[in-house]
Amino acid sequence: MKIAPPNRASHSYVQKLVGSPAEVFPLLCPVREAEWLDGWDPVAVWSRSGVAEPDCVFLTPASGGASQDAIWYVTRHEPGNGFVEMLKITPGATACRLTIQLTAAAPGCEAEITYTHTSLGPAGDRFVAGFTAEHYGEFMREWEARMNHFLATGTCLRGEVGG
């Protein structure tokens, strides 16, 4: 058995969103995300309700040099608390824990989003090395702009986000 210290990177970011936690929370879902995130298209979703719920599983296409689709598992889904936790396994690359905590903050809410990526091998080492605070900040600002556009207009912001 090999036991080794993890090669891991974790970053958090607080988004300022124009919707209330009750408006935002349902959009944190593999199905509903396609409404506001241009290009989001899961390969498959397993859900009794048809949307995010505890034990929902979904696949996203291989990306970033990965050879297999990523497997996502919703471990906690607490609408009343504005909290969701998901695990994402990209075989041969990374294991990721994603947490999102929504908190009411006028005029909408704040979303504290944390991604923690742990390498599972050489491909994961490369991913973790590139998962910098700068990269994460850019990713979060784009997500924030797209979510706010959807919350304000009800439409998906297509193409690149200016900044």
Map each language-model feature to its residues:
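Hydrophobic ligand-binding cavity/cleft-lining segments
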Residues: 1-51
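Short beta-strand micro-motifs in enzyme catalytic cores
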Residues: 11, 56-58, 98, 109
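Glycine-rich portal/gate segments that line the openings of hydrophobic small-molecule binding cavities
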Residues: 32-33, 44-91, 142, 146-162
